[in-house]
Swiss-Prot record:
GO terms for biological process: amino acid biosynthetic process; aromatic amino acid family biosynthetic process; chorismate biosynthetic process; shikimate metabolic process. Belongs to the shikimate dehydrogenase family. This is Shikimate dehydrogenase (NADP(+)). CDD domains: NAD_bind_Shikimate_DH. GO terms for cellular component: cytosol. It comes from Brucella ovis (strain ATCC 25840 / 63/290 / NCTC 10512).
Length: 289
């Protein structure tokens, strides 16, 4: 029996609360059709107080696993009986699967971040120094990816310095905390600049100028934003005008979905231009470009 036959009828889920317009079902639906797999990926809205019972009943409800988003990532971390290395390092789970009856948890955000850069800016990990703007939950995955790929010095800048200090303390050596007032000076020797803040995204000052001058960045520097709505953020527009190589955040969303699909359906999908165009068409329809 081949892997596709074994995957027949398998179900995976996507859960959060509330479930906003997620493109994960579109991504996995595209792959299921492309691979010819008779499976499903469905959105299930679960209230925070119900998550533990939901996680405990995955097998009974016929699920092979699924994706978890806000506000359940920490609860999924606590519910998992086994964690992968990325989930342990980041402290949050976005992917669940069943293995020999045990609930396992992983985090694919760091993988997605690095794979996006690998595809769009090969050699990005040769940078000795990286500058991460923002110290929220998403920045943990970014920092883990940078450290895993050998970046020697990671500067994390945040308006609330204590948040950056907490993140630096979590990861230890090679990660340094700075206040936002230090960001400008740090740009000049950063080989990679990552925006994880909401500045310039829809509903957060979109159309406004990004408040850091990027013209002093090294000419070979790469600038990437984990935000993908809008696709071209104020940060990326400013980086492009400064002559930097830019990478948008949509690829991170697409690549982070790969490991989960393989876990649940037994086939490793590819992130292709056709998939990207499929998601961009949906974004355009929703006025999210």
């Amino acid at each position: 029996m081949d892997d596709k036959s074994m995957a027949r009828g398998r179900k995976a889920f996507f859960t959060g609360f509330p479930i906003r317009h997620s493109r994960s079902p579109l991504i996995h639906g595209f792959w299921l059709k492309e691979q010819g797999i008779d499976g499903s990926y469905e959105a299930v809205e679960v209230k925070p107080e119900d998550f533990s019972s939901f996680a405990a009943s995955l097998a009974a409800n016929g699920f092979a696993g699924g994706n978890v988003t806000i506000p359940h990532k920490e609860a999924a971390y606590a519910a998992a009986e086994s964690l992968d290395e990325a989930a342990r390092a980041i402290g949050a789970v976005n992917t669940l699967w069943l293995e020999n009856g045990r609930l396992c948890g992983g985090n694919t955000d760091a993988y997605g971040f690095a794979a996006n850069l690998d595809a769009s800016a090969p050699g990005w990990d040769k940078a000795d120094r990286a500058l991460v703007l923002g110290a929220g939950g998403a920045s943990r995955a970014v920092v883990h990816a940078l450290l895993s790929r050998g970046v020697c010095h990671v500067s994390v800048v945040n308006r609330t310095l204590s948040r950056a200090e907490e993140l630096a303390a979590h990861f230890g050596a090679r990660v340094y905390a700075h206040g936002w007032d230090e960001a400008q000076a740090l740009v000049s020797n950063a080989g990679l600049i990552v925006n994880t803040t909401a500045l310039g995204m829809s509903g957060h000052g979109e159309g406004q100028d990004f408040p850091i001058d990027l013209t002093c960045a090294p000419k070979e520097a790469v600038a990437t934003d984990i935000v993908y709505v809008p696709l071209r953020t104020a940060f990326l527009n400013k980086a492009e005008k400064a002559g930097l190589k830019t990478v948008d955040g949509l690829g991170m969303l697409l690549h982070q979905a790969v490991p989960g699909f393989e876990r649940w359906f037994g086939q490793r999908p590819q992130v292709t231009q056709a998939l990207r165009e499929h998601i961009l068409a949906d974004m355009a329809k929703a006025g999210a470009l």
